[in-house]
């Protein structure tokens, strides 16, 4: 048991240390980069140290708990704590943000603000995953929006203002529903707001009210995850954002929606979840097929990868809605797995664009000969994305399959039908992945493009790719590494579920 405020330091350190960036020399790009990477590495070491020494894997209860009164007027507390569900996403956040900062090395325009915004996102993401208070959860959720909007609108492509505006309209619209759900749950049945997760978990609501709260939270998560039809901001955003921002979006931002769906909707509103889950299961199944089919029709490389992300999110939805130990484990494993694979694919797409200055697949071809290292890495991560055995994507999707097959909630025929449609989705994934590889790397197309230089991956880019590839293969070979972090938390969620 540690009484040292580890989580408060871990949450506040990136944004606090990041604010000193503005005191660094305006033209000292190298100093700014090393300073930011130093903060990210130190934060990752802090997270690893705190978790290794003070986190008990066999304890499903909240650990490293902190509770400080913040605003007396409406009994608002700074409540932090972690359990098996939040430890994986926090470690993923630390790892991907550090590599995204290294990936942002070529950014020289307003680099002080750029790196500060990345560190502000870092704090917001870790704050959200370790929050134990509904209002604090909402504040951390909102803390993400402004940095992402600015990163998009200032360092994006030609249509950056359009995609940034679309992003803020969608996510801010979803946040209104999130706030209504938070305030509704906090103020129900009491003169004083009850915002902490522990009390809310034991609170029972009238059925109609619980469905209303569930729906409010669901809309917010459906935008962030995204769930169709609220997904259209994602391809536009990924198509225009700088690839280091894409790494954070695909690696962490989308996972916040899935985390919220488990942490609040599943844990705090179980009756409504059992009503909504069959419908969400259908949506998740349709999403896998729809996004995989749409991805195949995309000319833009980054948009094709973005639609593949939407397709993979369908597996997370199905895992969460199976309401089984296996399915939920598979969903969390897919959250971690896709965090690595999605970030790597966007990074490689961005570095390829830096060299050839072409985004449309039908204009590419023959890149494998001048750039064999990029070709090798891109092929490896495409294989991971299409769930090649031995890679993390395969294990995650397989566990989700077992989860839906063994679910006692559904009858045999719906289970067979959903499994069959999911299998079609898995067949469609290699079609768009391998087609993307063929269009980019094979053939003998000559590039008549001014200012294009065919330089293969440098040491920095190779280092980032290998750093992401190692956990992808590691989890694929030994998934218990992630599943053991969950410990008894999944059983704990489901046991509360069936008791109530």
Curated annotation (Swiss-Prot):
Keywords: Chloroplast, Membrane, NAD, NADP, Plastid, Plastoquinone, Quinone, Thylakoid, Translocase, Transmembrane, Transmembrane helix. It catalyses: a plastoquinone + NADH + (n+1) H(+)(in) = a plastoquinol + NAD(+) + n H(+)(out); a plastoquinone + NADPH + (n+1) H(+)(in) = a plastoquinol + NADP(+) + n H(+)(out). The keyword Thylakoid applies. It comes from the Eukaryota. InterPro entries: NADH_Q_OxRdtase_chain4, NADH_Q_OxRdtase_chainM/4, NADH_UbQ_OxRdtase, ND/Mrp_TM. GO terms for biological process: ATP synthesis coupled electron transport; electron transport coupled proton transport. This is NAD(P)H-quinone oxidoreductase chain 4, chloroplastic. It comes from Ceratophyllum demersum (Rigid hornwort).
